Amino acid sequence: MKKLALALDVNDINQALEIVDEIQDKIIIKIGYNLFIKGGINFVKQIKDRGFDIFLDLKLHDIPNTVYNGVKAVSEIGVNYLTIHSLGGQEMIQQAVKAKEGTDLKILAVTILTSHDENYPKLLGSSLSVPDLAYRLADMAVSNGSDGIVCSSHEVKFLKEHIQKPFIAVVPGIRLTKEKTDDQTRIATPEEALRDGADIIVVGRPILKAEDRNKIIKEMLSVIEEL
């Protein structure tokens, strides 16, 4: 399993394709709903045809039948990973899992976004801490058939230690240093996330804004190999 995903968070389809064409190593490409809305299935296939695994980050969160139909449609276009939101509940997750039966699509349930801080559970009317809420959501998702979860590096070690069923842990908010420079509040370096149990790390701006993107990618792949 590839362990490095590039968050292709740009606004222009042509720019996105230029970046992908520049990349030498066949890593995972994460496509958010901005590019997916603009480029559609054809854009996904263009990336797929270049030899990359596709991580479609749509965070589906709707009534179970609607999510079932959405996942079914995604499963037919050769996507490797698709996100749903764990807050959608057990039945929604079960329907998402059912919809991709017979395919290689992996369902990843988002727990708590890395932009949220410790006040987030209170906004939901919960007295739980962020780690406890993340655990409740992750355990529920994995127990109902989700192949993996998306969580911050702050929770991944605890989740790996306490959720009994094996699962893929995807950790976004990866930065080259711990200095906070953007809207992500719960960040980690590649080394920290991987040591704590991340199976896939998602990196966006540190690669996209680099003068030499391939250099940064190779450095991260080297860290992955060492760990």
From Swiss-Prot:
InterPro entries for the chain: Aldolase_TIM, OMPdecase, OMPdecase_AS, OMPdecase_bac, OMPdeCOase_dom, RibuloseP-bd_barrel
The pathway this protein participates in, as annotated, is:
Pyrimidine metabolism; UMP biosynthesis via de novo pathway; UMP from orotate: step 2/2
Keywords attached to this Swiss-Prot or TrEMBL record, sorted alphabetically, are: Decarboxylase, Lyase, Pyrimidine biosynthesis
Q: Where along the chain is the active site annotated?
A: K59
Catalytic reaction equation(s):
orotidine 5'-phosphate + H(+) = UMP + CO2
- Tell me, which GO biological process terms does this entry list? 'de novo' pyrimidine nucleobase biosynthetic process; 'de novo' UMP biosynthetic process
Signal peptide range = none
Question: Can you tell me which residues bind substrate?
Answer: 9, 30, 57-66, 114, 175, 184, 204-205
Into which EC class is this enzyme placed? lyase
Among the GO molecular function terms of this UniProt record, one is: orotidine-5'-phosphate decarboxylase activity
- Its EC number is 4.1.1.23
Query: Its GO CC terms?
Result: cytosol
Q: Which Pfam families match?
A: OMPdecase
Description of how the protein assembles with itself and partners: Homodimer.
Provide the family line: Belongs to the OMP decarboxylase family. Type 1 subfamily.
Biological role stated in the UniProt entry = Catalyzes the decarboxylation of orotidine 5'-monophosphate (OMP) to uridine 5'-monophosphate (UMP).
* Protein name per Swiss-Prot or TrEMBL: Orotidine 5'-phosphate decarboxylase
Q: Name the gene that codes for it.
A: pyrF
